[in-house]
Swiss-Prot record:
<dbReference type="InterPro" id="IPR011150">
    <property type="entry name" value="Cutinase_monf"/>
</dbReference>
<keyword id="KW-0732">Signal</keyword>
<keyword id="KW-0843">Virulence</keyword>
<feature type="signal peptide">
    <location>
        <begin position="1"/>
        <end position="20"/>
    </location>
</feature>
<dbReference type="GO" id="GO:0005576">
    <property type="term" value="C:extracellular region"/>
</dbReference>
<dbReference type="InterPro" id="IPR043580">
    <property type="entry name" value="CUTINASE_1"/>
</dbReference>
<keyword id="KW-0964">Secreted</keyword>
<dbReference type="GO" id="GO:0016052">
    <property type="term" value="P:carbohydrate catabolic process"/>
</dbReference>
<feature type="active site">
    <location>
        <position position="168"/>
    </location>
</feature>
<dbReference type="InterPro" id="IPR029058">
    <property type="entry name" value="AB_hydrolase_fold"/>
</dbReference>
<dbReference type="Pfam" id="PF01083">
    <property type="entry name" value="Cutinase"/>
</dbReference>
<comment type="similarity">
    <text>Belongs to the cutinase family.</text>
</comment>
<feature type="active site" description="Proton donor/acceptor">
    <location>
        <position position="181"/>
    </location>
</feature>
<keyword id="KW-0378">Hydrolase</keyword>
<protein>
    <recommendedName>
        <fullName>Cutinase</fullName>
        <ecNumber>3.1.1.74</ecNumber>
    </recommendedName>
</protein>
<dbReference type="GO" id="GO:0050525">
    <property type="term" value="F:cutinase activity"/>
</dbReference>
<dbReference type="InterPro" id="IPR000675">
    <property type="entry name" value="Cutinase/axe"/>
</dbReference>
Amino acid sequence: MKTSAQQLLSLLLLPLSAIAAPTGEIEARACSTVTVIFARGTTETPTLGTVIGPQFLAALKSSFGGSVTMNGVPYAADVPGFLKGGDPTGSKVMANMVSSALSSCPNTKLVISGYSQGGQLVHNAAKQLPAATTAKIAAAVIFGDPDNGSPVQGVPAAKTKIICHAGDNICQHGSMILMPHLTYGMDATAAAAFVKQVAGS
């Protein structure tokens, strides 16, 4: 029989396992019609950011009747990661999150998406996934893509939407954050309509 002290220790240790370093596993929950794995941009607040993540989620919920889950990738989102072509650890975590989501909810419409450095993570994660996994991705949507012009490996061009504003230096493979890079919230509705079109209801 456990002593009261042992029982207390067990209760104290239980939450620690729940907040271990992120591995990319998706928390068990009821499966949604649409599941989005989203990577925010450099210096944005975890985990969906503010420029487009929340707006895109709201637009998707409107399009799909609310049955949408968006999981933000937990990663540093710092400048060194951007300069490396996308945070390596975050890229791996995103790939793991895609695999986990499809394993947990094989019938969900899986969307991979990112903004700014998050777009780099989308490209990197897709390269790390086997073809059998990328074949199950319903759509890829990137806003302000630093890798503009490059395909998302394994995802057909018809299921990929890269949104880049005129004058966005990041989309021109630069490193300057100009006003056009901060206005992608206006594209949330169009992006959601694209997902609806290619993924179906």
